[in-house]
Amino acid sequence: MKKILLCGVFLSIISSCQVKTSKSDIPTIIPTNNTTNEPSRVEPSPVETVKAAQFGIIFSGGGVRTWAYVNILKEIQKYKLPVTSVVGIEWGAIVAGVYAQNVSANEVEWELSKFKGIDDWSNYIKKIFEKKSTAALKIPFGCMSLNLKNQTSYVLNKGQLDALIPYCISAPGMLKPFSDSIASMSDVAGAVQFLKASGATKIILLNVNPARNGKPLSQSLQSLENQFWIQSNSVLTKKNNGIDEVIDIDISAAITADKFDQRRDVLNSSLPQAKDQLKKMASKYGY
């Protein structure tokens, strides 16, 4: 059972209230080749009378691939889909944090344009989130963090953003653990619980990891980085985890997660896919 815990000082930096989830909370995943075990993709369907639906968004990880979220958010803004809360995983936590401030796709694009390179990630986060508190956000925000010492997953959702987010973005191949914490990639139940507790009635997963289609994020299946992405993606896209819609953006396998110099290519290649899939989803929900 999920528990909402009030926490005191989190690692001497974060004074926050967190949704804590233990290993036993993570859904059991039964391997199968049956595609009916996955969330339905956005397909044309009769218009549902659910225009009052309130959407919670999970921004999955993917390093530079998360720049594709700019185009998705612009389409969400275009169709005026009501977003009530957001959760970010790995680099998706940065996008979610910026978006939660003013629910603006243009602001996300502007802040991402300030990124110089992975070696400057710490200064970048301090710069764009300086003096930004979760209490001042327009919609609730959380990011997924796994503490390696106590093997516990948290939804960090209270405190200063520049202090919270570093605990949520480390991943193999790019960043070392931050204060014994890395991005929690598999605790979908914790993310869904937080979004629903924040008022969401429909959960959307934004996925820029094409490993599910046999196109890994790195060139070799033997790499630990690629094994990490495939494992996390296999959990994210299962139907039994409470996700209602999945927006898949298929980006060239040549653009690996750590190739931040290819941000423009990600933006260009994701635009038509974002337009097509969001048009279908908006129609499905009556927008």
Please state what every model-predicted region is.
Residues 4-13:
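Sec-dependent N-terminal signal peptides
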Residues 17-89, 98-287:
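Patatin-like phospholipase
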Residues 92-93:
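Catalytic nucleophile loop
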